Amino acid sequence: DEILHHCFKGCATQFSNYIAARSPKDFREFCIVYFSFWNENMNMLSILNKSGIMYRFASEFESLVLMMSSQTDPKANAKQKENSKYKYHFAYRTAGFWHVTELWCQEHPRKSPKEMADIMMEITSFPCGIQII
């Protein structure tokens, strides 16, 4: 367990640095960067998936996203945390995002990061185009 935790933490640090270096300006751009990172690290995702331990990375992923969101806009983040339902919204969103990643890594042929960004935009928008995430 400790070895896995160390590996996950190292990957999470790489992921965080990758996102920070690209500074996505909006949700679509974030999705492109996100799926580009995992596309470049597909071997690791495939190993996690084939060994049946990919689900264990989900909690590390949730912690990482929470940390990153607090760094990007502390004022907005503080307002969100004042909402008593914030933790439920956050858990729902990150779990959904991670599950999409799991499905995507199993695809052959795999969609490009831009195609996945388009899908994520569609998933997170109401029919009239209002962003829900």
Predicted features and spans:
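Residue-level detector of well-ordered alpha-helical segments, enriched
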Residues: 3, 7, 11, 26, ...
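Solvent-exposed, amphipathic alpha-helical segments
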Residues: 14-21, 30, 92, 96-107
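C-terminal peripheral helix-coil segments that are non-catalytic and often amphipathic
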Residues: 70, 87, 94-95, 99-133
